[in-house]
């Protein structure tokens, strides 16, 4: 069975897409963003293609593309569409698959369903991206508690940001969830720099090793 990883975060704008690009590039994986909110600037799928050095055939089209950069439920309402969360199913592919959510776990897709509800149905391992700055201990532990309460498997925590040794130590200690590594903020964000940073800060074998 091909490896599938769900990338979520403790908040929005913390680096999930950059981490997703790094992981997808390292595994030569497929990438899927089920719902994209906001189309005026580069989409997350376009960013991943650029940063991961992936072929466009490795990017699975979004199930919903919404115009307004807002929570998916609100974007859908503005666009006068309704997201059918029951129709969201993990794609079948012939290589590893990286799935990126939007914002945090409790971001609503509709007025009845949040991302964590869908993740609970999928039962695929989650990688939680977390900031290293002030406030992240509380946010990360709350997110892990929510995943645990729904029996969603968690592969580990991927920190994003400046090195904070105690923060990166105490969260795994209190939660029992392992630290996968830390992706530093890069002064020059390009495919080569991202590839090198991922190699230096993460063990590819944790994710099952690189694919041909």
Curated annotation (Swiss-Prot):
Disulfide bonds: none
Pathway of action: Cofactor biosynthesis; biotin biosynthesis; biotin from 7,8-diaminononanoate: step 1/2
Gene Ontology cellular-component annotations: cytosol
Catalytic activity field: (7R,8S)-7,8-diammoniononanoate + CO2 + ATP = (4R,5S)-dethiobiotin + ADP + phosphate + 3 H(+)
Active-site positions on this chain: 33
EC number: 6.3.3.3
Binding site residues for Mg(2+): 17, 100
Ligand binding (substrate): 37
A single GO molecular function term of this UniProt record: ATP binding
Signal peptide: none
Entry cofactors: Mg(2+)
Transmembrane regions listed in the UniProt entry: none
Listed GO biological process terms: biotin biosynthetic process
Tree of life domain: Bacteria
Subcellular location: Cytoplasm
Chief subcellular location: cytoplasm
Binding positions for ATP per the UniProt entry: 13-18, 100-103, 184-186
Keywords from the UniProt entry: ATP-binding, Biotin biosynthesis, Cytoplasm, Ligase, Magnesium, Metal-binding, Nucleotide-binding
Record-linked PANTHER family: ATP-DEPENDENT DETHIOBIOTIN SYNTHETASE BIOD 2, DETHIOBIOTIN SYNTHETASE
HAMAP family documented for this protein: BioD (MF_00336)
Subunit-level organization: Homodimer.
Family: Belongs to the dethiobiotin synthetase family.
Function: Catalyzes a mechanistically unusual reaction, the ATP-dependent insertion of CO2 between the N7 and N8 nitrogen atoms of 7,8-diaminopelargonic acid (DAPA, also called 7,8-diammoniononanoate) to form a ureido ring.
Protein name: ATP-dependent dethiobiotin synthetase BioD
Lineage: Bacteria, Pseudomonadati, Pseudomonadota, Alphaproteobacteria, Hyphomicrobiales
